[in-house]
Amino acid sequence: MDYSEIMVRHGELSTKGKNRMRFINKLKNNIQDVLAPFPAITVRSDRDRTHVYLNGTDYQPVVEALKLVFGVQALSPVYKLEKSVPLLVTAVQDIMTSLYRDGLTFKIATKRSDHAFELDSRELNSLLGGAVFEVLPNIQAQMKHPDVTLKVEIRDEAAYISYEEIKGAGGLPVGTSGKGMLMLSGGIDSPVAGYLALKRGLDIEVVHFASPPYTSPGALAKAQDLTRRLTRFGGNIQFIEVPFTEIQEEIKNKAPEAYLMTLTRRFMMRITDAIREQRKGLVIVNGESLGQVASQTLESMQAINAVTSTPIIRPVVTMDKLEIIEMAQAIDTFDISIQPFEDCCTIFAPDRPKTNPKLGNAEKYEERFDIDGLVQRAVSGIVVTEITPEIVNDEVENLIDALL
């Protein structure tokens, strides 16, 4: 027997009341996006669960993809068959025979929503359990914590059998909590921040600052590859490349060295906020961790935040670097993040950046710039690319390999 579908159980969606179907429909759309590399698959959702019909597709890579999708509490590969007692008996015997080993314990757990079926749940449990003993006389039944719980569901349209329950990612479906702009540099922290924002249902668009020729095509490809890794958790992501060369050169030429980083981050925040407003986002997300570097002291954050009234979410702000690294390794972004390409935050980094910059000083130094013009030119020059879970070709990876 081959699995016919993966049955997905919803997570926190059960608490969403009148908005429940909106959340479920969004989860369905996200699952369809993530499973786009499997063209034979179809997806259907109802109030209780989502059905991923395999239609001949190997179930294992599908399970691996679904395990990462936020909003999924658990999933089970399922056999679908006609509602016939003889067919159920044969299926249960075949499945348990394939799983059997010495000392294995089991139980049958039947659920019947089709009350017109000839046997009730209790009778089915007894009948199917007896059928297992017929072919495996040495197997042991155990009602609490058995090795195998064989779940049988009798529904209006068919019967379903499963024995695996695989833990999902939990959280909320991406897109159910609004849209935010993720400032992604290419380092270790910002992809982790993006992952945690996605987990709470935030639909992120990635904002990446590029300063050619100071930053290379490899740095851009690296940021896009990190974004692609994040698509596994909720579907396609818009990648927004911002031209930042003019601004960085202006800051380098006109500002004191100690304030280079503060002014750079203030311009980045202004531009991200302008893009957010243009694209109807609600928040800005970044990977700042308190005290980790000079620009992430409270004084620096205050001086940088002053350019916007938009809420700024910092998911990793209280995490140690080792905690962030462990999470980056778990979500498979760490090895990409440590590839040796310069980004906008490092190319003109001063030897002794100001750790307690004064807002008044930052504003005074900015009087030397045409702030509105610089921001407007950067925003008008953005390039937007849709990043999908499916790598259509290997151009990005080949480019990175060639540059390393």
Swiss-Prot record:
**Family as reported in the entry's similarity comment:** Belongs to the ThiI family.
Q: Where in the cell is it found?
A: Cytoplasm
State the encoding gene. Answer: thiI
**A cellular-component GO term for this protein:** cytosol
Class of the enzyme per the UniProt entry, highest EC level: transferase
Superkingdom classification of source: Bacteria
Task: Show where the THUMP domain sits.
Answer: 60-165
Give, as in the UniProt entry, the pathway in which the protein acts: Cofactor biosynthesis; thiamine diphosphate biosynthesis
Specify the protein name.
Probable tRNA sulfurtransferase
Q: Which organism is it from?
A: Streptococcus pyogenes serotype M6 (strain ATCC BAA-946 / MGAS10394)
- Tell me the residue numbers annotated for binding ATP: M183, L184, H208, F209, R265, G287, Q296
Q: What is its main location?
A: cytoplasm
Q: Which GO terms describe its biological process?
A: thiamine biosynthetic process; thiamine diphosphate biosynthetic process; thiazole biosynthetic process; tRNA 4-thiouridine biosynthesis
Query: What does the record give under GO molecular function?
Result: ATP binding; CCA tRNA nucleotidyltransferase activity; tRNA binding; tRNA-uracil-4 sulfurtransferase activity
Q: Which Pfam families does the UniProt entry name for this protein?
A: ThiI (PF02568), ThiI_fer (PF22025), THUMP (PF02926)
Briefly state the protein's biological role. Catalyzes the ATP-dependent transfer of a sulfur to tRNA to produce 4-thiouridine in position 8 of tRNAs, which functions as a near-UV photosensor. Also catalyzes the transfer of sulfur to the sulfur carrier protein ThiS, forming ThiS-thiocarboxylate. This is a step in the synthesis of thiazole, in the thiamine biosynthesis pathway. The sulfur is donated as persulfide by IscS.
Q: What is its EC number?
A: 2.8.1.4
